[in-house]
From Swiss-Prot:
Keyword Ribosomal protein: no
Pfam (any one): ARD
Name of the featured protein: Acireductone dioxygenase 1
Cofactor: Fe(2+); Ni(2+)
Entries under InterPro entries matching the protein: ARD (IPR004313), ARD_euk (IPR027496), RmlC-like_jellyroll (IPR014710), RmlC_Cupin_sf (IPR011051)
Species this protein is from: Caenorhabditis briggsae
């Protein structure tokens, strides 16, 4: 379950970083910012049908797989630092976790961070223009299926005046204010 989180630094970002006392973020909190989460059962014989339904629902036409692992990913620390930098994209970000665990952090309307723990079978939809970041947990081993509408552009706009002035950010803010 997602929760509002304490401040995470590069040194502790792979920990839970829960507030004390804990404050859960319910489905309505995520819905207000356009984030959707569901489950995909990889142990079900019909898993491909479930994936095909998600692909159709979100009009995705391209997918690939990423393995984020200290042992296999070149420049792991550098990559994880980039993933954890607060940023946004022009396109939606859709991920299905096939193996391992990590955290997606997203900004609530009041700028607080909401942490979404993800494990095998978790699906996350982040709308275009939302500020977010990602990190593995301490296992440092995640395999994710990435779904895209088109071939990925991989353009990230870090949180700054530059990111705030992106047309997709302005559209996102209008969408979540409606």
């Amino acid at each position: 379950m997602a929760y509002f989180m304490a401040n995470a630094t590069r040194e502790n970002c792979q920990d839970e970083c829960r507030l004390s006392p804990n404050r859960d973020a319910v489905e309505e909190d995520l819905k207000k910012i356009g984030v959707e989460c569901t489950k995909v059962d990889f142990d079900d014989a019909n898993v491909q049908e479930d994936l095909d339904q998600l692909i159709k629902k979100y009009n995705m036409n391209y997918h690939d797989e990423i393995h984020i692992c200290r042992e296999t990913m070149p420049n792991f620390d550098e990559k994880l630092k980039i993933f954890f930098e607060e940023h946004l994209h022009d396109d939606a970000e859709l991920r299905v976790i096939k193996h391992g665990a990590g955290y997606f952090d997203v900004r609530a309307k009041d700028e607080q961070w909401i942490r979404i723990p993800v494990r095998r079978g978790d699906f996350v939809f982040l709308p275009p223009g939302i500020y977010h970041r990602f990190t593995t947990d301490r296992s440092e081993d995640v395999v994710a299926l990435r779904l895209f509408r088109n071939n990925p552009k991989w353009t990230a706009f870090n949180r700054s005046e530059n990111g705030d002035k992106q047309p997709i950010r302005e559209q996102y803010l209008k969408d979540v204010s409606a």
